[in-house]
């Protein structure tokens, strides 16, 4: 018997478990922590928190200028349960929110006042691009250097989804060459 937190766990081979007559079960998912972490990362990036904390320990106070969220564009890859919660908080900050996914629900977009868009528009327009899709082959390497090159140089990339949705090697290149302003990762 295998029990996992959440209803889906990509690290469990369900086919092999079934062949071996192993029961796999999951607990009910709690979506609240993921949007909270997403916003902790966004706020930390927008306000340069790591740099400010490091500077404070060295005796410097308020050494950077943060980014105001009001009026900025929040792009979401995925507008399911987690993405919808992130969108609501973005709207509360006065952000314009846009979303794309392969199975985007237009009724959800309308209900949340989220602009549906193409992947291309979602890559090039946001000030903050946050990923909220399930890992796996469907979205593997959804964000590579090709996409990061099209992002605003001042944009931040946030990923609290599981799996290799962002190419790690490409992200390192984009950050080291200042193709994007920063990244927040779970």
State each model region's role:
Residues 20-22, 26-73, 88, 92, ...:
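Phosphate-binding beta-alpha-beta segment of Rossmann-like dinucleotide-binding domains, i.e.
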Residues 18, 87-91, 152, 175:
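Surface-exposed amphipathic alpha-helices with a cationic face
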Residues 2, 97-101, 183-186:
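Short, hydrophobic beta-strand segments that form beta-sheet elements in well-ordered domains
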Residues 79-80:
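Glycine-rich Rossmann-fold phosphate-binding loop(s) that bind the pyrophosphate
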Residues 1, 23-24, 97, 116, ...:
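Hydrophobic beta-strand scaffold residues
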Residues 83-84:
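N-terminal Rossmann-fold NAD(P) dinucleotide-binding loop
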Residues 103-185:
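Rossmann-like adenosine-cofactor binding region
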Residues 1-25, 30, 124, 144, ...:
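An N-terminal-biased, well-structured beta-alpha scaffold segment characteristic
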């Amino acid at each position: 018997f295998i029990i996992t937190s959440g209803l889906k766990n990509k690290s469990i081979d369900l086919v092999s478990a079934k062949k071996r007559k192993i029961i796999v079960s999951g607990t009910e998912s709690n979506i609240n922590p993921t949007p909270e972490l997403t916003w902790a990362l966004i706020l930390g990036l927008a306000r340069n928190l790591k740099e400010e904390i490091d500077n404070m320990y060295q005796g410097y106070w308020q050494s950077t200028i943060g980014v105001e969220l009001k009026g900025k564009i929040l792009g979401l890859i995925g507008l399911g349960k987690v993405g919808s919660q992130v969108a609501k908080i973005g709207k509360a900050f006065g952000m314009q929110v846009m979303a794309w996914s392969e199975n985007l629900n237009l009724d959800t977009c309308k209900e949340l006042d989220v602009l549906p868009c193409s992947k291309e528009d979602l890559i090039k327009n946001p000030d903050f691009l946050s990923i909220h899709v399930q890992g796996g082959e469907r979205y593997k390497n959804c964000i590579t250097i090709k996409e990061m090159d099209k992002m605003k140089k001042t944009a931040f990339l946030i990923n609290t989804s599981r799996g290799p949705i962002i190419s790690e090697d490409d992200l390192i290149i984009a950050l080291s060459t200042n193709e994007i302003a920063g990244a927040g990762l779970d």
